[in-house]
Amino acid sequence: MSEVYNHHAVEPKWQKYWEEHETFKTDVWDFSKPKYYALDMFPYPSGVGLHAGHPEGYTATDIMSRMKRMQGYNVLHPMGYDSFGLPAEQYAVTTGNHPAGFTEKNIQTFSKQLKELGFDYDWSKMIATSDPKFYKWTQWIFKKLYEAGYAKHIDMPVNWCEELGTVLSNDEVIDGKSERGGYPVVKKMMKQWVIDQQAFAEELLDGLNEIDWPESTKEIQRNWIGKSTGVEVDFKIVGGGEFSIFTTCIETIYGITFMVLAPDGDIVKGLMDRVENPEEVQAYIDETLKKNDLDRTDLNKTKSGCPLKGIYAINPVNGKEVPLFIGDFVLASYGTGAVMAVPTHDQRDFEYAEVHGLPLIQVITNTEGTVDVTKHAFEKTEYLGKGCILMNSEEFNGMTVEDAKKAITKKLVDMGVAREKVNYHFREWIFARQRYWGEPVPCIYKEDGSIQFLDDSELPVVLPELEDYKGHGGQAPLENATEWKHYDKNGLKGTRETSTMPGSAGSSWYYMRYIDPDNDKEFANQELLKHWMPVDLYVGGPEHAVGHLLYSRIWNRFLYSKGLSPVEEPFKKLVHQGMILGENGIKMGKRFPEFVVNPSDIVEEYGADTLRLYEMFMGPLEVSKPWNSNNVTGARKFLNRVYSFFTEESNITDENNGNLEKVYHQTVKKVTNDFEALAFNTAIAQMMIFVNAVYKEGSCPREYAENFIKMLSCICPHIGEEMWQILGHDDTIAYEAWPTYDEAKCVEDTVEIAVQINGKVKATLAIGKEDPKDEVIAKGKELIADKLEGKNIVKEIYVPGRIVNIVVK
């Protein structure tokens, strides 16, 4: 397109300038200025490159970085790549080529696209999680987690995906299928590396109160952690054996009419030689093992089960025998693997009892005794805090629920069969994958079965090249590395771990490595960490709420406990950008490639500054919004208009007649405040008001013009630099001082007030703020003179700055 502003010439020119002059290289040792650390969630370098949704969040941090630099901050704004991942591995399996080459090619593509968009990244700080210089320290931190007892190697049920040949974490499973590929996922018992998340639960919950994050994300994490305070009670089994349950509703214990055990738990295994229906029970267990946790709980529409015929538990409060069942909705890996069932006060139990013909015992009612539990349960949301009382509960009859909770707990504790306890919903973080393209676990399985981690001097343990990158028969691909797998060195003999770490390993601490990426003595210098942490602004998608955003907090908490992180929380402020949808409102991405808008196409036709301006003007940053090609054209027209005016020498004056004073100061104020609030769309709207005003005036004082260009350059850096140079400056605009405003000059001189007759608005009147009362009333009466004809004025009322009210008869 032929335009006044030639982006094809201007944008490459300034990108070359920034690179050659290292304009955005941060001296991390410069402690003379306040610091500002802006960070984007780093991307996985896929083969398809960026789509138009990617630049939105990146532009937001770029604007903030540029403004803070002008405000005198030492800014760190790095970029890197979360470069371990399944697509590269699938490429290796398909082609036989090492995934490193595929990954490096993709990184180059991504970096080229990001540079074309004009972001002020310090590329000298770039990291990639698949770089051995980086994952040496991922391995080192994992070793420290193991030495501290937080990383463990245990038997546990895992989410197994046969098609991918690997274990998946809970957040990688969606609706019973793998997040990537949509393949079936089943439960399987395996030895697994796990990290004990529960050890950090209280610190994670407390920390949420100290950080500026979206409340919705904090609530998601609270629910995922799932803290509940209750009582753990021991139940003996008739004929020998016992198990425990955890309950937050101890007040209902007299209403137990059955109990349910996890089909795949150890309790049931110990009863198989005593049940009267072993074939039926085993068949149910086998079916359960085909399901994942979501199938068994969240997605389970009807609660299935199978009786353990002939097996009964004894209720410790009254000695009554209750039948035992197995049900797939009870998970061996959560809580104790057993639950008590009170059909009258839990709707799930009520439905289960209906299906299996089990009795109902009501133990809570209102003070009138009018609660009916024959059609549905009377649950805790209905009775807690409502003055309800116990019934059918022996000596606790007539007590309020709240008093009975304490009294029943005391009785059971005194009997030695119960203890107060805190439970958490989230479980161990599975920290191993049967894949090749991930960090090797730096340990050896010795011949006696024990585990020994390698000395720090042997880190990093580097991935070997393979002829076959596919695992076979459920084994990890590294099983194919026969020579590498067998270890015999310095008196230590054994086999290496052949599972690798998950993709979430490197991303759990990468924000620290940016600060000191070339350090080969420690993961980052402690003095630098103390100065730069925490991250001041972190921008990324909400889909990472219980994955990366939780894992990062866990790793940071661990490092903090060891004196290796200076802060309790890694990310001070978190913002989720909304999705940019296709023109038809469908999400851009690999599922619908036909709706993807390629940013390179927009940059080619309209320029990077147009793309940046358009995406920031689409609407609030946090809101999802559809792409609109017509509005892209509108953004470009605005830039042409700006360029045309401010590069015309005759339009820029060294004198100031005061006509633009108010709109200028209002613009500086609003843009400054809106940038701080990340309200870029309204900041741009104010810039447009200013541009309209200067066009109307026909000229602009040099001070106002230059300061406007500074502000615009944060959003549109190429055109900003170009106009700055045309106005006679040799150096980059990036380090110029941010403009200031005079509050007194932002105030409107006039206000609009209502003119009323007998309290009803008849007109509006523009008046000066300092106009005297008599003058305002006179103007108001003059404005509505035709409506006052023939009326007798009884009273004239003036509320300063608001209304004139003429009372008539």
What are these regions (language model features)?
Residues 3, 7-15, 138-365, 473-475, ...:
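NTP-handling and nucleic-acid-processing catalytic cores
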Residues 1-39, 69-78, 101-109, 213, ...:
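Conserved oxyanion/phosphate-binding beta-strand-loop segments in alpha/beta enzyme cores
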Residues 82, 147-159, 335, 420-449, ...:
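Helix-rich, typically C-terminal accessory recognition domains appended to large enzymatic cores
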Residues 27-99, 103, 127-141, 247-248, ...:
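N-terminal catalytic cores of NTP/NDP-binding nucleotidyl/phosphoryl-transfer enzymes
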Residues 311-317, 321-334, 363, 480, ...:
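Alpha-helical recognition segments enriched in aromatics with Gly/Pro capping
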Residues 243-265, 429, 435-437, 441, ...:
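Conserved phosphate/anionic-ligand binding catalytic regions in large, soluble enzymes, centered on
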